[in-house]
Amino acid sequence: MGQEGMGYNNGKGGGGGGGGLPMTAPRPRGASPLSSHGHHHRSRKIHRTFNNVKITVLCGLVTILVLRGTIGLNLSLPNQPTDADALAGAKAVEDIDRILREIRSDGGADDDAAAAGDLAGSFNATALNATEAAAAYASAVERYALGPKISDWDGQRRRWLRQNPGFPSTVAGGKPRILLVTGSQPGPCDNPLGDHYLLKTTKNKIDYCRLHGIEIVHNLAHLDTELAGYWAKLPLLRRLMLSHPEVEWIWWMDSDALFTDMAFELPLSRYQDRNLIIHGYQDLLFEKHSWIALNTGSFLFRNCQWSLDLLDAWAPMGPKGFIRDEAGKILTANLKGRPAFEADDQSALIYLLLSQKEKWMNKVFIENSYYLHGFWAGLVDKYEEMMENHHPGLGDERWPFVTHFVGCKPCGSYGDYPVERCLRSMERAFNFADNQVLRLYGFAHKGLESPKIKRVRNQTTKPIDDKENLDVKAKISTTS
């Protein structure tokens, strides 16, 4: 699920200066005294076209080699570069800058040449070998970033918290302050029913947050047009981390995921020395290199420098277009079971953690003792059985904490599963969770597939006593 929109691509030229290609269009024939030099004009036009082709071919080759050289075709950590390697890489960057300057200096630029110049500005690097490619890619990354490089966020945040005691990083009971973040597209769904179920999933998240003292943000804006689709969450998370230093944990949750255990609480004390909490399996990640070893539909980031650094390292595969397409080929070649499609945020994170394990994994907690992400297909038809045999508050397969409708896409015009099955299953999941909320007020749904409700507890003259005696983890009746 993604959103984000203010561009941070400093490599993109606008009108005017900045080293981009000149934006003056060729003068039409007959509109100037210079038209008498038609032969010279045609010669320069042919030469300019040839130069544009050179730019396009050069940039395409550089991008392919840079991505392959940097990301690699294996999952081993790259050797640390020596001083000589760094010097060679710097020379490579200098050489390619010189070549592009020479090409740009000859003749004007039409729209195609301007587009090629933009690409060249983002990837002004050569790739004679893997070391030089890495140096060149690092140079390109400087031109595309989520935002200005921040290196002292922990210190800035500590100072802010000291200066603003009215905004502590903890809430009642000393619990860390959490901000749940979700989002959806700014326009209406292709399927009208999609908006209805989007409202239900949002209501479900609001209910859980209200019960557990968690703040919530539902974003509708595209904050970065380069990171659309799967990737839109990254710039949003960064913006929220920096805008809310009082928040200790940022919790991303896809719009198609629902809380289905309203009594379960995150065991945050378990994660004292970790900064990323994500559902997954160690064996699928490190032994099988599976593309579904982790799930980025629901995960938590600590608000700290480490998380900012990870976002910066995670984002470079995300810019839409050629870069994302080429990165997708590399991910498919290296992650088991991954279909051939453009780079997605989940595969990119898995690849990053595999290829740079020593750098990141000591701060990552791969959680599977409860369902921070629970795949819906194996859960929704077992809710009655769960209600018969178990109770809320468990969070695992007995009573899943989160049910995630991966592949359903209720807001889109297509999905991996029949839309009728998806909508029926989402209705069951919502009502299963909603019963846990409604019983606080003495009501319940007549059935898991019915929006209608019934009274399950009579009103009394001593409602406070009833409230105090209510156990949110008690079993829920399955009778209609």
From Swiss-Prot:
Among InterPro entries, the record links this protein to: Glyco_trans_34 (IPR008630), Nucleotide-diphossugar_trans (IPR029044)
Lineage: superkingdom: Eukaryota
Stretch list, region Disordered? 1-45
Q: What is its main location?
A: Golgi
A GO CC annotation recorded here is: Golgi membrane
Topology check: give the Cytoplasmic ranges: 1-49
| Segments traversing the membrane | 50-72
The record's EC number reads 2.4.-.-
Q: Does the keyword Glycoprotein apply?
A: yes
Which GO annotations describe the biological process of this protein?
Answer: xyloglucan biosynthetic process
Compositional bias, Gly residues, is annotated for 1-21
The glycosylation sites annotated in the UniProt record are: N74, N124, N129, N458
Q: Which GO terms describe its molecular function?
A: hexosyltransferase activity
Q: Which loops or segments lie on the Lumenal side of the membrane, by the record?
A: 73-480
Enumerate the UniProt keywords alphabetically. Answer: Glycoprotein, Glycosyltransferase, Golgi apparatus, Membrane, Signal-anchor, Transferase, Transmembrane, Transmembrane helix
Localisation: Golgi apparatus membrane
Give the record's membrane topology: Single-pass type II membrane protein
Task: Give a short account of what the protein does.
Answer: Probable glycosyltransferase that may be involved in the biosynthesis of xyloglucan.
Family recorded in the similarity comment: Belongs to the glycosyltransferase 34 family.
Q: What is the protein name for this chain? A: Probable glycosyltransferase 2
Q: Which organism is it from?
A: Oryza sativa subsp. indica (Rice)
